[in-house]
């Protein structure tokens, strides 16, 4: 959201306020790199939650045996459906359906029309949504709304003499993250509909996207009354485990190249330096390790030169894209690092 805040008033002649200062100006050149970073971070979080939801065991697949209707969960799932609709609508506005069809599967587009398809493990995991509380639909809704906002800002962003569609669609990483984001929106709708008792939100438009959501709701409701062939989820065993594993592997390979260069995905407040790399030893010339800092993992090495420990400068990729942090947050992180380091290795050489 700090990036959205930084780009909100870029095109307006308004002075900065007194409460906060954006770290840098988002220009037409670097905006789409920020968008890819934002999409990648959201896809990683949503897919991690989706996979952990699939690993959750249930006693029975009977929907009546799970918790009863909850108005708060219903409200959040209704918001997820609305967020997915707005995201699909923004995609349809920025890129034509023909362009989207070229790099997506038939689960979302078919014969030039929007189509939302559900899989067997989606039906199985939809019954588990009532057990995890409103946090999971809130996560889906937040990222979908964030992506919609970033794309809406990017309508007027782009290189000179290039429109948004031609410029963005020529980047392979951009096509990959858009495919992953639309997959997140697809299964978010499928997981939210059973919690809403197969009711679509009031006022959902009757356009192609709204009709696709309503058609998916009707098909899932009809599938509820028929035999699906899904066995019990004891021991994490299902009938289509090979297809489900291939599904997660495909999405992981889709966003893996972007994740390696995404700074936001590597943000960790804890330092996990191996304590064995800090011992003094005259027999060891070079001691190497890896440390995790607020702006990513970086190689670290030390050399014993004449009894003095020499530490090489840190190398940080894409340092200019790191999220802003306050001095207080940095001091707390360093304090946590020193405390954990001293506890794990009391005889280590002080930094």
Swiss-Prot record:
Taxonomically, which superkingdom? Answer: Viruses
Q: Which InterPro entries match?
A: Herpes_SORF3 (IPR009823)
Protein name as it appears in the record = Uncharacterized gene 90 protein
Originating gene: MDV090
